[in-house]
Amino acid sequence: MLCEQVLGKLHDFDTTGKTIEYVDIEWHEAFKKIHKKITDKGTEVGIRMDDSILARGLYQDDVIYADDEKLVVVNTPPCEVIRVSLTSGHEKMSAKVCYEIGNRHAPLFWGENDTFITIYNEPMLVMLQKIHGVQAEKEVLKLDFDKRISASINNHHH
């Protein structure tokens, strides 16, 4: 099966009587044009997107295949992240947190209750824990790309 475009979001489709198959696209794969994957129901899927995917990405609940019987839908699995919160009275440290995360080209998301979320790596966690007035904890959660702060999301390292 070949999937070549994002057809919309799952909530936009009538799913009555249709099988929904999910294909896992990790956060760092979301902006790649070509994938070879297997859905949760065992269907082999080739994904070949056009250049627009380099800017848009593949996100949770994107429908990439639809026919009368089946939908193939993107699932973004949970991943290790760092949840960053600011101690009361140290709200201005948000500028330092955002600068340090951005300087490392790491993706940044809004979290719940005035927190920030970034992808986990040990050096980042250690660095954030050393900033006065900042609490940083490792967690596993599903990224919400609608809450991204970063202009781009990629797996870029120096």
Regions found by a protein language model. Give the residues of each.
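Residues forming anionic-ligand binding surfaces in small-molecule and nucleic-acid pockets
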Residues: Y99-G111
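Short, structured beta-strand/loop micro-motifs enriched in basic residues and often containing a Trp
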Residues: T39-I53
